[in-house]
Amino acid sequence: MRRLILPALPLALAACAATGTAFPTQSAATAQTAPLEIDRAAYARRMEGFWLGQSIANWTGLVTEMDKIGGEGPRGEFYTREDWGQPDQPSIFDPGQPSTISPAIDFVLRTPGESWGADDDTDIEYIYQDALLKHRTSILTPEQIRQAWIDHIYDETKPTPYGTDETGYQNYLWVSNQRAHELMLAGTLPPETSDPALNEHWEMIDAQLSTEIFGLFAPGRPDVALRMADLPIRTAARGEAADIARFHVALHALSAKVDPQRPLGPQLRAIAEEAAELLPEGEYPRAMYRFVLAQYESGATWEEARDAVYQRYQVDMQDGYDISSRGLYCNGCFAGGINFAAGLVSYFYGEGDLRDTIRIGTLAGWDSDNPTATWGGLIGSIMGRAAIEEAFGTPLSGSFHIHRTRKGFPNDGYDDFAAMGERSLAIIDRAVAGEAGGSIDRARNIWIIPRP
């Protein structure tokens, strides 16, 4: 049975999505021209849900990160739904050792009294939020980005609290972000830090996983979000990898249109169609989007869709995606492209169900924590913390430890998702009034955001 793609929701309905109130009875024409009104207090709870949902998905996905990347032997025997709850299998990083996070492929949860540790899916976004607040700006300069990275990220050529890895001292940066940081330490400013002549990893996934939050800083206004995210994206990516990051930023901005009281699947497909308009025709991200969507609409299982992605892009190198021809480590398993396609599998087939989306993303393969964390944050922001806890049937920790991977923050790096959400309101206030041409009604505690 074919699944239908519904048209995009009128943007004016996002006020109700943010507040949980009933939808207004207004004409379609009025809905298309009326400014967006969003309750600030309710949106702070959405931001709290973003951090919590992202952390659950990140840590669950880390259990299977790089277990299955294609090729010969066990690493090419992809997981299926039957593997959920079963013992984790070794990754390419340590072929003789399963995950130290969890012995089984299952949800990783932190309950009150515990803390969520930072990872590269959350820590760069935390740094950017802090920098925007520190400088009281909506658009970070090259110098501000460089200084924030240097202030809060360890230099892997010097001792760190985390020991060593195969490239030096552990600093929890990889591929393009690591090279960008090295260039910053040498005095280079973004966007030259992603120049292919200086950074050979510019096609990797780094920019996507470190910039999605900018979409949430500009609710309902992807145009504003993309201006805010432009330089952070180009800090680590160029070309198609940057386009993929822009898609995710726009998707997060458009999520303000989603009504959590209605089925999420059709609404998520609708906003994805809008965000996909940013993907240039004739390039592989647009082709990947259409291919995965066609697999979903055909009635294929998610495993069949994932296997088709592997065959089409990693084996056959269709639609201009030729990473496999370059002899890269792990066949480009960190690349923005293959992980974009794999992530779309969990996005469409998860149909807006947080648990199902995390399950599929965790089992889909490749850099499985990154796309999964993206969707956990997106869906978590729509749900809010209370609904996330209801979905998992248990109270969950709101404590966050940024110093698991980074440095230089107050309180030895311990923070709280609710406080992080509250702090983000100042960023959004500035973006609404300064970048979007909107206003803040303090009496009603709402943003009034005009349409672009």
Predicted region positions:
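Active-site cavity-forming subdomains of large catalytic enzyme subunits
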Residues: 52, 114-120, 124, 129-245
